[in-house]
């Protein structure tokens, strides 16, 4: 997400002590008085585990989205929610999880990322969840205490499970200002950590996971996931083109923080300028001397990379406020369909209330069902922009 503003979960078992200590560390000054915890409704999918806890918001001004940029309807509320899953996955479904901007979970020490991690492991086998893909803005201020909390919240994730990370603007620069590209990410998550999943194939820069390619054998086909840094530089795009060309036996999806806007068009500064808020080219990473690095917004990335490759079928991104959703289908140069998805929930209370996306590939090999679910609340959203299907051509497998 875009701004430059400031900014308890109960875990009883002794094995969780490290996580608890991080959660309690000097965070109260950032978020106000420590909130009490209230019992969440029992998630219908969580019968195998105790219900999650949802932290009440701090008293007074809320930690998270700064008051001066809140919309009149803040905090937003997802509509058409219910605990019942209307269309459970059929046998043979392949599932990917998308974890949009988690910055306020880290900044405010909310338990929702922990709840998401528990859910992924609890449902991994039953739902055939092959990987979880983050969409950047992992932290709010690129601060050690936030990275520590973020990492501790992922403790339930098994070493063999692919959890894919990349940077957003708030993961860069002093206090997440994106005035430059300095980040603490590599100090907490390195190649050795990523290789435990067995999916990491290569990185652009040794020791840095912001630009990385993963290969996941989902049984019916090989899925490639290309993770790209915030506002990819020209050198990054050159590397990405070479990678996708080398892995022509993979069907590839791309994840980057800022690509699609909330009106379901790509970020395009040359045509729309500041009309599209929070374009990557307006940040310090694209200003002054750094402008020579050739930063890309969505439309630039489409033309320089995405449209050129017949094996790319999907782009996912976050970053954008207001409705936080968008969907666009375009045709690549080879006639292939490329679907582009925006998902972000940080404008909800508590920075998102744990909502994530479940991207389910049905057994026909070409139809995806996109679902929105919160493990913290035990609720699905069936609003049209939260629950929908799309078809990939050519099919991923037959």
What are the roles of these predicted feature ranges?
Residues 92-95, 126-132, 158-164, 218-224, ...:
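Loop/turn elements at helix/coil->beta-strand transitions in domains of secreted/extracellular proteins
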Residues 45-146, 274, 398:
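N-terminal active-site segment of His-dependent metallophosphoesterases
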Residues 105-107, 140-142, 167-176, 209-212, ...:
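Active-site environment of divalent metal-dependent phosphoester hydrolases
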